């Protein structure tokens, strides 16, 4: 009670003090009924008065609670008093009260673990238990802390006092994944130092780089994290870019030379030749000579190391002159000096003279009156001269510098046109206008034509333009000669006075003045980068721009990163360098993170959470400490526990303050739209985060949060207080890092950074045009500013410096040209001073200006011509000439006729010169004093009878012979081009050609492969040696001649032949004269026949029957008939009358061929290519010659029935059945079918030419089969190929080889039976189980059966007899079953799908794989590329599993290997695969045969041993076959290998045969 009352008393005293304070301020204390709880809305007082009454209310609440507790205790006391009053009083021992109970005297208890109490004399004496270790306190930094107390020495460390020791721990920081870290000020945990570690490389913050592992990724280091984006390759400036290792985008190939490297498009000057400019174009260096602008007429030589001459001096006559220095001149009357590359000359001053036409005396500079100068000509005093003006003759005289003239009649001169009217001088008329003799003029409408009147005839031609007096003249439209009124420079026309930039050299500023262009270098400002660049059309190099996120920034510009405004970027050297903006230090210790920097003091970031300013929150690690956020600063204090009215408070687990047991919970406060606020809880009203409220026992008190001053110049308004996370500038908000145009200053750019705005002038990129217009901020090329004036694009304006020019602005470029003028109506208009366009009020002719009507000497020919200006057109005419006194005068000075030489037929001849007369006149002329006299020529006699006079010639010449389009002279001999062993001779216009008749002059002559006649090894005959080139007659016959011919190598040799006599065509027999002594050829007593145009193409028989003559090209061409060689002796030869060649007398001896006697003269055919005949007991055979074939890829050479030579037919195909049986179709598909019946293997399904059937046998095993026999049906004939090579034809056994013409031929080659059928069918049977059927390409698309349809597509080979595709190979094979076989009617089993390896087991499959592996080994390696081995390997494994162990497995293996080798041979590859123990083939060694894997299909026999191998192979179109062959050097004859010399005699005549055949009983012609 005492305690409670004391507490109540203290509350009352405190309440009174508050009331007095409130009363002093004039307020009243409101009273509320006890037990009534006010709501949050009613308890919120307005204004400052309510805030002042707030503490009073709190104390009133506490006082009311204490009074209520006193009331309850009072009731308990009254109850105890009544109990005590009923008890008897006994003396009691003193007691103590503690922990809610009474303790007897001397009792000891512990209110807590470190405090002990003892009851003495009714009082509790409590004290600390310092002797216990865990009850000792702690002291740190001068501060004392109790046991168990938690404190924080700084914001990042939490400590606790336990048993006298302080235990501290830092904050829980996450692990960092970086190389370097740092702890920012005010933070507890370290962060990664700005920068990125990527792929083992350290990059600074903000830098942009390419990934080292993938160059197509562009990465940026932002906030210690790497962000990568795929690069977009720009379009390549070259047509063939190259992708280099380590690069993403293809680049243009550069150039390397002499240790230097240049990029594509880069230009440079070679060190040794400054005038040589080279350029790199995709790895190739192209060089050209620099074109130097003509800046002055006499520039000084280039400075050392430079190319172009300079105008700071003059180089003249091989000497250098400085500017201003005198220069020597060829004119002594002028003084010249050098002026900046030009020579300026001034005439020497002359005194005045008293005459009007003073003349110049040679050697003097000034004119004097001792002579006259008139119309550009010099005359001596007292000299008389004549002129022609306006068609009249004028006589003038010179008298002391004065000229007087008078008209005079002209003498009559011969001219082409007679004079008319009163005009006495010869005149010309052209286009209705008359011109005097010698006048020159330009006809109207033809400005580039000049005419002159000569001998009364106008002669016009193109005007010869003089050299222009300027260096860059222009050819005006419609003008004849170039003009210096404008300049043509690098194919561009510029007006006079125009300034322009050279398109080829943009760093040259040029000026056009009077047709000459002068250029000077442009001064470029210095650049701030190491590698400046020059763009197209730019003069000066500039630093490259930067491209970042598809935005362009100029060099030196600072800007915000387009995607991250927290980064500041700067463009340098074409690369954007970015880094985080520096953050200002926050004015508080725990600011909130802003957009870029942690500087928002409107709240606190503490312990990983964010709190608004004014918020109270528990300490993140000590629940007994309470923290408060005040403008970014955090203050944490230990919770203060209020005194409790109960004697025994209870400390609940997890709580910081003890509580009275069963004490009623303080009343909470309602919150709109949320749960009730607890007692002593702070909260913000909904929608008003800037106010802070406190709930105390159901009452709510609120106040506005205070705002600290913002540490920035332009803060924006935050939720409650101004914030530096952004800017408020001129009424607009901007994000931190944002750039924006200044709203107050034009052309300025502002940056918002952490609440402050800074503005600076906008950076401008240099304009890409020479005359940019003034833009709003920067110059742009949308218009032009020219000489201080602004113009719009496409606007025309007058040139401010040249009133006659008109300029055009186009995209910042200004082009000025001459103002267009109307074309004048005259040929030589004049531009008066102050005017822009020409007029016809005067004339300007070749730099000379004259008034209308004025006459002056022609500037082009001042000696011989005068010109007059007539209304803007100059009319020029030649001065008159005196008449010539000779009939053939030549032109003299001024083209006047003189008699010093002769002019004949348009050519001038000197006096006394002799020359030919006119063409065809046959005259010889002579020039004498202007007169020409001619006499007729006399032709010399010719020694030939045939003479011809050509057109244009005077005299005839001897005519030779024309042969093969070439003329040969009379008596010449030559070898015709088409026959090297013939000789032709020309005699009296007749060409006679015959084969050279050879004779021998030695015992052993030799004949080379290219010699026509045999030669003797040396030039010696009958003991006499002859020199090279010497010829002689070897015997008494004058027609025989020998010649000693030199040889290219070795000594000379002797060649002898009979002379060739010319043909005496047309000579009558009565006029034939025999040859005289020592003469060889007869002659004709009269002239031979002439081959005229009427006889062209006709033939004539000469007296010699060995010649045939034909009239060709006006020449008789006589050819000697070739006689065949005779086999009979000379004694049995005779020449029939009227014949040329001898023949053998008919013999009676017969021939024996193949055991058959043949009569002499009888002929027979061996095969389609070879025919034989019997002559004089000898068999002669002749074979047809076949031309070589060139077939396409889908065709091959093949023989048709009845033909000798092959022709191009579709390529043949083959089908094979082998093993257990596997079928490879014509189209290449491999099938497996094990039926043991008879089946159609291949058949001609269109015309029924053939049908091949196979009969399979299971050999006593179930589910397997092998080919047992083959039946070939040819019409009515049936051929069966049985086991062990047996063959029957129509049921009868036959011996091989077997021939039944013309259909069938069967032979045995080795162990293989080969059947040839007339339609081109071929069947190969090994006598065991393998059969191969080959058909020519003509059967493409016509076959059916197990071999398929031969249409080139393997996918549709499973077609049954009805033409339908069947679903399985077993169904397909069964559909072609036929009812026949080895034993008709025997039982057979249909094919089904089986797998013999599954039944045989794993071991059998493994052994089969091992043995069949030879197909994939080296013996067959060359074939793998052309024939895949996998199908054959699978078939081989299948067969070995089916065959089982033993010798049958060896046969199955050889079948599969032989099948694969056969396909390899057809593909052109011959594998060598047989070995001593692998599939050995035996051949009859006793008959000389050996085995050959790829033997010739047409072996060497006695009948074809003389045929070249290449021709023999070309005739036998089948590829090589394995079998028994004769070794090299032996030939086959009657199944034996014998030497060629042991063959019987067989004579072959005619052309060389290509494919001679053996006897019919051995082998017929092979067909594919």
Swiss-Prot record:
Residues 27-49 are annotated as: Disordered. Its main location: secreted. Residues 1-23 form the signal peptide. It is found in: Secreted. Residues 136-193, 194-253, 253-312, 312-370, 426-485, 485-544, 544-602, 602-661, 667-725, 725-782, 782-841, 900-959, 959-1017, 1017-1085, 1082-1145, 1149-1209 form the VWFC domain. One of its GO terms (cellular component) is extracellular region. Residues 1483-1543 form the TIL domain. Pfam families: VWC, VWD. Glycans are attached at residues 340, 499, 1090. GO terms for biological process: positive regulation of BMP signaling pathway. Enhances bone morphogenetic protein (BMP) signaling in a paracrine manner. In contrast, it inhibits both the activin-A and TGFB1-mediated signaling pathways. Interacts with BMP7 and, by doing so, enhances binding to the type I receptors that contains cytoplasmic serine/threonine protein kinase domains. Also able to interact with activin-A and TGFB1. This is Kielin/chordin-like protein. It comes from Homo sapiens. The lineage of its organism: Eukaryota, Metazoa, Chordata, Craniata, Vertebrata.
